[in-house]
């Protein structure tokens, strides 16, 4: 599934992605790419995540123990490339490989308790590990032990002897000529030691090269385990769900984690949203500041989470498989490219309609940058064009009559409640007052869209000097509309 960086930013997808926290270097690198899975890969990913999630819930494995083993693991991308290209004879690279193999051997018996979870061949991993592990070596570190080669033992002993002789001569006040001879001898011995160490490292790398396939498999296995474990921990932290593929996009008691965190951070609360969008184009109407944009963003996140095998922030959810998700929102900045806001919108529509494949379109008040009459007419045409291509979509708008002949479903934000003034309530004119009166829940739309703009303005403290005139004008317009109908 393709989605533009701008659409990702609009949804808050990058902030959500930051909440998914694999602990290993390789896992974190992979997660930053927001991997969208093929259908076959998705099925296997879902199966493994469910097995691991159930094991965590049942206490068969401990997330903290697994996390401690995964946390220090390096990425082997560079080490494996060097090894396969004929290199790899460097202590640091071999050290990284041994770290991973050791962790795999430690993790295998723990994950074996998760019936059905795929494992790598323990014997093959042990054989690769044995190439890097000599008797007496630290278990998780690679060191070039003297016991690996008689020549290495001899070269190290000679280097030590030469260094001691030089230090003793300096301490005894030896002559310059004597010190020069000893210095030259020590340097020769040191160079010889480096040559022998290089030869031994090359032999280790050569022996390890025959195990390259095992190392690659083990490295991928431990990275996937990290990714899956972090997905399960995220689901548990959210109390979320694993979204299921379906012909509909349905969310039960969902919330936008990024928006919720901001609200809670300033002492507020958030309201969960539920909706069920059938195949085709659906509409969403409601008051200004009523949560329409957040509902669309949540829908986009569920599509992304579903396609990526991530948990969704909802009690339950289904998602549609599509080739792309497109967002129509925020084109007002188009003036930077020599276009008016309306011109930028039109260019975005044209680009959208040139796309191929199956798609889902999220449109946040499109056609709002021109006159209401022209905007409603253009939006009607855009919705029809999206539907004619067999795409799905959700269009948020204030044009309540638009799309009625095409839309598969229509939703509305409940809007402002009538609540009597209470002692201790937030003062009128504050955002807190508006939030306390706004009902952000979604309901199936019934009739024309509610118009709460004047009430919202009043709650935000706009004075009667403006509002009294606005009410008279609106009443006059509504009266004229009723007479003409």
Each model region followed by its residue ranges:
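Catalytic cores of large soluble enzymes that bind and process phosphate-bearing ligands
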Residues: 37-44, 68, 89, 96, ...
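Short, well-ordered alpha-helical packing segments
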Residues: 53, 77-80, 98-101, 105, ...
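Glycine- and acidic
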Residues: 58-59, 204-209, 282-286, 365
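Conserved P-loop NTPase architecture
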Residues: 78, 102-105, 136-260
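Short helix-capping/linker segments at secondary-structure and domain boundaries
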Residues: 84, 107-114, 232-239, 309-311, ...
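ATPase nucleotide-binding head domains, primarily ABC-like/P-loop NTPase cores
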Residues: 238, 245-485
């Amino acid at each position: 599934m393709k989605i533009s960086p701008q659409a990702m930013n609009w949804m808050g997808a990058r902030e959500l992605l930051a909440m998914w926290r694999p602990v290993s270097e390789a896992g974190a690198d992979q997660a930053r790419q927001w991997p969208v899975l093929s259908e076959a890969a998705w099925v296997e990913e879902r199966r493994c995540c469910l097995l691991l999630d159930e094991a965590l819930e049942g206490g068969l494995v401990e997330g903290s123990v697994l996390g401690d083993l995964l946390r220090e693991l390096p990425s082997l991308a560079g080490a494996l490339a060097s090894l396969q290209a004929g290199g790899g004879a460097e202590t640091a690279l071999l050290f990284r490989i041994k770290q991973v193999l050791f962790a795999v051997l430690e993790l295998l018996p723990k994950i074996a308790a998760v019936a059905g979870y795929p494992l790598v061949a323990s014997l093959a991993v042990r054989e690769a590990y044995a190439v890097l592990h000599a008797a007496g070596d630290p278990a998780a570190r690679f060191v070039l032990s003297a016991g690996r080669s008689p020549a290495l033992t001899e070269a190290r002993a000679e280097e030590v002897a030469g260094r001691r002789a030089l230090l003793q001569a300096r301490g005894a006040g030896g002559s310059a000529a004597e010190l020069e001879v000893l210095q030259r001898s020590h340097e020769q011995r040191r160079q010889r030691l480096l040559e022998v160490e290089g030869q031994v490292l090359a032999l280790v790398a050569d022996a390890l090269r025959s195990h390259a396939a095992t190392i690659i498999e083990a490295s991928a296995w431990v990275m996937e385990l990290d990714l899956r474990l972090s997905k399960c921990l995220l689901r548990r932290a959210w109390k979320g769900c694993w979204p299921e593929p379906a012909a509909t996009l349905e969310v039960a008691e969902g919330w936008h984690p990024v928006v919720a965190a901001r609200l809670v951070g300033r002492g507020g609360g958030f309201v969960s949203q539920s909706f069920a969008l059938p195949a085709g184009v659906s509409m969403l109407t409601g008051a200004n500041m009523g949560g329409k944009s957040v509902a669309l963003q949540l829908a986009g996140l569920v599509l992304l989470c579903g396609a990526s095998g991530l948990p969704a922030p909802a009690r339950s959810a289904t998602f549609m498989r599509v080739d792309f998700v497109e967002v129509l929102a925020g084109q007002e900045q188009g003036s930077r490219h020599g276009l008016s806001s309306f011109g930028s919108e039109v260019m975005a529509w044209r680009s959208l309609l040139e796309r191929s494949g199956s798609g889902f379109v999220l449109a946040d008040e499109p056609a709002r940058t021109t006159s209401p009459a022209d905007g409603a007419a253009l939006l009607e045409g855009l919705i029809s064009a999206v539907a004619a291509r067999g795409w799905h979509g959700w269009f948020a708008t204030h044009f309540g009559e638009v799309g009625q002949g095409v839309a598969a479903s229509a939703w509305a934000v409940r809007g402002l409640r009538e609540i009597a003034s209470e002692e201790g309530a937030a003062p009128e004119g504050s955002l807190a007052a508006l939030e306390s009166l706004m009902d952000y829940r979604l309901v199936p739309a019934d009739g024309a869209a509610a118009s709460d703009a004047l009430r919202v303005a009043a709650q935000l403290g706009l004075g009667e000097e403006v509002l009294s005139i606005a009410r008279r004008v609106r009443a006059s317009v509504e009266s004229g509309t009723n007479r003409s109908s």
